[in-house]
Design a protein with these regions (language model features):
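Recognition helix of helix-turn-helix/homeodomain-like DNA-binding domains
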Residues: 31-47
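Short alpha-helical "recognition helix" segments of helix-turn-helix
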Residues: 23-29
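Short C-terminal boundary/hinge segments that cap the last helix of small helical domains
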Residues: 61-77
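Alpha-helical residues within the helix-turn-helix
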Residues: 16, 27, 58
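A short, Lys/Arg-rich alpha-helix, primarily the initiator
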Residues: 1-23
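Short coil turns linking two alpha-helices in DNA-binding domains
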Residues: 21, 33-35, 49, 63
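Short, basic-rich loop-to-helix N-cap that marks the start of a DNA-contacting helix
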Residues: 45-58, 76
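Key DNA-contacting residues within the recognition helix of helix-turn-helix
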Residues: 26, 39-40, 54, 68
Length: 77
């Protein structure tokens, strides 16, 4: 059975296209703050809360499908 994992490549592309760094998610002018631990999870493609993803969407004024997608991991099972 194949598994899926989250991929945040779209998020990183949006930040880059806007001239922003990943640390904009930690410290920004809008007052939204994210822990560096959560930023590390995003960087590793790990799960974060839905609330965190929605906060990022609100911060960047995008929809969820614009920042995250799933990718299939093929297993031998």
């Amino acid at each position: 059975m194949n598994k899926r994992k989250l991929n945040y490549t779209k998020l990183w592309k949006i930040l880059k296209s806007r001239g922003l760094t990943r640390y904009y998610l930690v410290n920004n002018a809008l007052g939204y703050t994210m822990s560096t631990a959560t930023l590390a999870k995003l960087g590793k493609g790990q799960s974060v809360t839905t609330e965190t993803l929605l906060d990022i969407c609100n911060l960047l004024d995008v929809d969820l499908d614009e920042i995250v997608e799933t990718e299939v991991i093929v297993t031998d099972e």
